[in-house]
């Protein structure tokens, strides 16, 4: 450990400078780390990091931050904290959490607290809306096996679905209203097209979700069926009679 007259501190284990601390920052020499550590994905399960936090053994349902920051607007307040940490649930792998919220009071007191979850299987949960320039869903035919064309009846399925306006609440447990929306109900869609509905766990409760891609496919099929019906309606009456006669007689 080296301390300069200006108060700067340098950590140099075995004579190699690893970190430098002064009154405004902490600087870590990451190049020392990369020179002696593997950079492949397959090894990361056993590799630590230049800054490494080991929480050790923890309880079955808990969350501990790894790093946290906080700021407040001068003369206005709105003390906000952001942290990255690990959440543990019973009998399962951990979740990476990014939490953004008030540092003035708890969520129980009505203060904001958004928790973004990153699960081990690649699933991501957001408590709010997503705003993107576009969203692309993998739909390559090479990824789809056992294909079977959807049978007729899509138009009837669509007609049986009811469209509602409703207040969307945050969760099964938290009934505070997010905003007014319009849409369909997952339970209704599940009766007509079960492939379009999935079940996920949100805040300890099972919640049904809808695949917009599947709903779009159902609408496309319904439009195709409607198009055939319109063509039939536009067909002249005598042409229809001729078609029926041609089934029984050949000229």
UniProtKB/Swiss-Prot annotation:
Any Pfam family the entry gives: Peptidase_S74
UniProt site (Cleavage): 139-140
Domain of life: Viruses
GO cellular component: a single term: virus tail, fiber
Organism (species): Enterobacteria phage Ox2 (Bacteriophage Ox2)
Subunit organization: Homotrimer. Interacts with the receptor-recognizing protein Gp38.
Family affiliation: Belongs to the S16-like long tail fiber protein Gp37 family.
Gene, per the UniProt record: 37
Major place of residence: virion
Name the UniProt record assigns to this protein: Long tail fiber protein Gp37
Domain Peptidase S74: 139-237
Coiled-coil annotated residue ranges, if any: none
Keywords linked to the UniProt accession: Host-virus interaction, Viral attachment to host cell, Viral tail fiber protein, Viral tail protein, Virion, Virus entry into host cell
Region Interaction with the receptor-recognizing protein gp38, annotated ranges: 134-137
Cell compartment(s), UniProt: Virion
PTM summary: Proteolytic cleavage and release of the chaperone in the host cytosol stabilizes the folded protein.
Gene Ontology BP annotations: symbiont entry into host cell; virion attachment to host cell
